[in-house]
């Protein structure tokens, strides 16, 4: 797998590199933030719970310091120059609730006031296979959290990304393949049993995110837009709904443990695809825009549905109209 130490390091005293990461306080996002910080980035961690993010920041600071000392001691030799205490970035918290579009706009506005450019936007946050629920904005909760809120967040921050020819990395999932034919996003799959049809809702949201990435690459060719499947990361809060179910929760816990043992990757390994897309200098808008990467940063191909440009355009148009109907101009 990719060793992130071979990727470029920046000196924040010389060059101010800015990254924005949604859901950066746990799991894959935590390690994405850690490595961006080690590489000299000013990182804005966007999430709902200030206490959890403050705790995550302290843990990341401690882990980064530990890794810098290990690298200095030669106990953890890498292929690249390695991190340095003198070249670490900085970490900041932005309140972001993806189930509230007005909150999403406020978060973007705050960043617009704080910075004049963004080098990397990582749309990392998401939920998976939860019960059917509608948000206050009138969208199915998985669709809004995984796709629609990230759509409007990205569009609001786009001027800062275009200012420095930045990069947009959106975390999809291999689960998007469950959308085996194009479904209108207004379809909620309100059928029983939920434990079956919730996966179709999840697949729709992750397919839409890839389609959005494809359309961004077409509409804004000066920004590198990429989508990733991080790998089968089983040690994640995404599965908490299933493992906490009465009676059958223990069955799902055992199932996820077995799948993780044979096929899974760690949270840090799951962050590698995002890190490659964010930092690899060999990626360019000319040859890589709109591509899809999988575990460890390997280039791959997403589903037929997600690659269909006409259907991607339909998803884009539907999203813009839905947001305008709710008072959000795109």
Swiss-Prot record:
The chain crosses the membrane at residues 27-47, 245-265. Glycans are attached at residue 282. GO terms for cellular component: lipid droplet; membrane; mitochondrion; vacuole. Present with 892 molecules/cell in log phase SD medium. The active site is at 172 (proton donor), 202 (proton donor), 206 (lowers pka of active site tyr). GO terms for molecular function: oxidoreductase activity. Its main location: other. It holds the Pfam family adh_short. It is found in: Lipid droplet; Membrane. NADP(+) binds at residues 28, 97, 124, 202, 206, 233, 237. It is a multi-pass membrane protein. N-glycosylated. Its EC number is 1.1.1.-. This is Probable oxidoreductase ENV9. Disruption phenotype: Exhibits lumenal vesicles within vacuoles suggestive of vacuole fusion/fission defects. Leads to internal accumulation of precursor CPY. Belongs to the short-chain dehydrogenases/reductases (SDR) family. One of its GO terms (biological process) is vacuolar protein processing. Keywords: Glycoprotein, Lipid droplet, Membrane, NADP, Oxidoreductase, Transmembrane, Transmembrane helix. It comes from Saccharomyces cerevisiae (strain ATCC 204508 / S288c) (Baker's yeast). Probable dehydrogenase required for replication of Brome mosaic virus. Involved in vacuolar processing and morphology. The keyword NADP applies. InterPro entries: NAD(P)-bd_dom_sf, SDR_fam. SUPFAM superfamilies: NAD(P)-binding Rossmann-fold domains.
């Amino acid at each position: 797998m990719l060793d992130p130490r071979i990727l470029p390091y920046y000196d924040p005293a010389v060059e101010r590199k800015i990254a924005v990461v949604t859901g950066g306080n746990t799991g894959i996002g935590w390690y994405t933030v850690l490595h961006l910080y080690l590489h000299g980035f000013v990182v804005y961690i966007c999430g709902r719970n200030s206490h959890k993010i403050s705790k995550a920041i302290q843990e990341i600071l401690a882990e980064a310091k530990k890794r810098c000392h290990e690298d200095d001691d030669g106990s953890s030799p890498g292929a690249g120059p390695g991190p340095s205490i003198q070249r670490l970035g900085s970490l900041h918290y932005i309140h972001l609730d993806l189930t509230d579009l007005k909150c999403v706009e406020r978060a973007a506005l705050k960043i617009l006031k704080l910075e004049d450019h963004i080098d990397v936007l990582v749309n990392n946050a998401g939920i998976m296979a939860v019960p059917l629920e509608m948000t206050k904005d009138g969208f199915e909760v998985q669709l809004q959290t995984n796709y629609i809120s990230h759509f409007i967040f990205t569009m609001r921050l786009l001027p800062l990304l275009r200012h420095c020819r930045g990069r947009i990395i959106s975390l999809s999932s291999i689960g998007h393949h469950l959308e085996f034919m194009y479904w209108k996003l207004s379809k909620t799959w309100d059928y029983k049993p939920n434990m079956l049809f919730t996966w179709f809702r999840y697949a729709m949201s992750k397919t839409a995110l890839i389609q959005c990435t494809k359309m961004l690459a077409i509409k804004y060719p000066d920004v590198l837009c990429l989508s990733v499947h991080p790998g089968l990361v089983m040690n994640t809060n995404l599965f908490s709904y299933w493992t906490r179910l009465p009676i059958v929760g223990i069955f799902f816990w055992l199932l996820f443990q077995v799948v993780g043992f044979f096929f899974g990757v760690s949270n840090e390994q799951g962050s590698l695809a995002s890190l490659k897309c964010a930092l690899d200098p060999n990626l360019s808008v000319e040859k890589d825009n709109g591509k899809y990467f999988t575990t460890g940063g390997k280039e791959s191909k997403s589903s037929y549905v997600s690659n269909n440009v006409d259907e991607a355009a339909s998803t884009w148009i539907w999203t813009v109209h839905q947001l305008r109907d709710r008072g959000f101009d795109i």
